[in-house]
Regions:
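Helix-terminus/linker motif at the lipid-water interface of multi-pass membrane proteins
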Residues: 1, 12-16, 52-63, 181-188
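Transmembrane helix-bundle signature of multi-pass secondary active exporters and lipid flippases
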Residues: 1-7, 39-43, 74-81, 136, ...
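Alpha-helical transmembrane segments of multi-pass membrane transport and lipid-handling proteins
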Residues: 29-82, 112-116, 171, 178-179
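Residue-level recognition of pore/gate-forming positions within transmembrane alpha-helices
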Residues: 31, 44, 53, 78, ...
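Membrane-interface junctions at transmembrane-helix termini in multi-pass inner-membrane proteins
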Residues: 75-106, 148, 152, 156
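Membrane-interface helix-loop junctions in multi-pass transport and translocation proteins
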Residues: 98, 105-141, 149, 154-157, ...
Length: 192
């Protein structure tokens, strides 16, 4: 879903980039970030609010709380990736793919090594897998907006206003939806 939303902006972004209008291009990237951020926020909020009941009803013989926590940690990664995903296209447009490729390879190697170390030498178990991925996805919170701005020759903090707005919106959305959810009766079976 997120990939489809991101891809839908690409033809217009390409057209604007070809025209050389950087200001309009940055504005369009911010719109794309807002859209993909909104989609990832809706998914995350829905899962935070309803996920526990979903797992409890869907998999009654499994440890629903464990599954819920793992799912939330995985989706927290998507909160980061969701908002910066459109910026990956900057590297394709500007033909500056080396740095993002090296960062992706490096974080992949660090991810595997750190998972192995945490699984082998700690009692984290499955949490080690999702937590290392979450922590390393935060790298994209820093490198992607800065390098995208660098490639477009704009101020390095250009995209952070959209990212901060995304995180604030996510926090408010989760709070309001959870508050509303608590007003409904408990869900004990598929019919209620």
């Amino acid at each position: 879903l997120l990939e489809s939303a991101t891809n839908s902006f690409r033809p217009k972004l390409l057209q604007i980039y070809a025209s050389g209008n950087t200001e309009t291009l940055v504005s369009e990237f911010k719109k794309a970030m807002k859209t993909t951020g909104m989609i990832s926020n809706i998914i995350f909020t829905g899962f935070v609010v309803c996920g526990r009941d979903l797992f409890r009803l869907w998999l009654p013989t499994q440890n629903a709380e464990f599954l819920y926590i793992i799912a939330i940690i995985v989706l927290m990664s998507d909160i980061i990736i969701g908002v910066v995903k459109p910026l990956y296209y900057v590297f394709t447009l500007t033909k500056k793919l080396k740095v993002p490729c090296f960062i992706t390879i490096a974080t992949g190697i660090i991810n595997v090594v750190s998972m192995y170390i945490l699984i082998r030498y700690t009692s984290l178990g499955a949490y080690a897998v999702v937590l290392t991925t979450l922590v390393l996805n935060y790298v994209h919170f820093f490198d992607t907006p800065i390098y995208a701005a660098y490639c477009l020759k704009v101020k390095l903090t250009t995209f952070y206003s959209s990212i901060i707005e995304h995180f604030l919106t996510c926090f408010i959305q989760v709070f309001l939806m959870y508050w509303a959810f608590l007003r409904f009766p408990n869900c004990d079976n598929w019919l209620t």
